[in-house]
């Protein structure tokens, strides 16, 4: 695309997505999650957005985890999070949990966004991650961009930093 200066630039683009709310209160500062096990070091590594804001989770017991309670309606919800393994954690299993619904996968060597969609029953229950599961004391994993939203698919990441009720991105 020729510009005024005659230099071709990359193709302009827009992200067209519906309005969504990230219901997680602390999507990057995971150490602030209300229910957790393990040691959490915020701003430990470079995240997928290119800044120093990924959290390192270190196993101090069998299964490190973090959870937040969410008030659900009887509709579809999608959880998503970016995960990157360190050392011996690569290839171990982790679980994304929405209430009693569990998605299991393996911890990758490179940053990967994992997504899990499920229809929930109405009520208040937890959303969380157990990583790795099972763990050995000292296992380390990087996490970033923890998101839970109403909808049958994940949209682009919506950062939150302690806002009660989450953050809404307009359409």
Give the residues covered by each predicted segment.
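Extracellular and organelle-lumenal recognition/adhesion modules and their flexible linkers in secreted
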Residues: 1-171
